[in-house]
Amino acid sequence: MTNQTAMQYFEWYLPSDGQHWNNLADDAQHLADLGISHVWMPPAFKATNKDDVGYGVYDLFDLGEFDQKGTVRTKYGLKEEYLNAINQLKEVGIVPMADVVLNHKAAADKLETFEVVEVDPEDRTQEISEPFEIEGWTHFTFDGRNKAYNDFEWHWYHFNGTDFDAKRNKSGIYLIQGDNKGWADNDLVDNENGNFDYLMYANLDYKHPEVIENIYEWADWFVETTGVQGFRMDAVKHIDSFFMRNFIRDVKEKQGQDFYVFGEFWNGN
């Protein structure tokens, strides 16, 4: 087997000029000449604003196509420019890999009221309050997309944690209460901070069947729409590993075993 070389084709402090996809398309042949076999691209989804690197993901179905969060383009450009960059990479024999952020959602459209307990940030298994109601940013309506591609709306019960109580204007880590709610099982996420299911924003609850169904639907749509040939999975130490194994298995069964998947797992060990 010929040695392969993957390149991370972005860094945190790129200019927010919307030209990154165009630059990548123009650079494709040069990368191939250098011997690059795989290119890891930054998150292509609509995030909190046009300057967001992409990890504050808002709408997985908006690749820089709809006027949402004050912008049509993402930090990197428009949907058609993203698709063109992918096609240019494939034409010169480079495998394009998408950065996929499935741990959380940010910048919800509406507040909702629901019950939580506050937990210790240093040990998320330790509750430090009795149950109480907060107003949290958990209702995602995606009005700018107007139900194109997918009509799912996210509500508080699709998440298991959030980090801000608008009612009291107070940040914290709030474990959402309700039937079958709670962090992922301790043996299915990293044990840093007791249970590291929660990282930031509104944390997806992979015990909820509607969440799983929507993410599977998104993956089918995304690969068909873009033609990417691999995923870099963000923040896998924070995501239920039972879901993640099944998700990767499903993608490979549909796209072929050569579909390249790797994950980010930061650990001090």
Feature locations, PLM:
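N-terminal structural segment of carbohydrate-active enzymes
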Residues: M1-V95, K110-T113, L204
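Residue-level detector of flexible, active-site-proximal loop/helix-junction positions
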Residues: D67, D163, G268
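Active-site-adjacent "subsite" loops/lids of carbohydrate-active enzymes
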Residues: T125, W154, Q177-D220, T225, ...
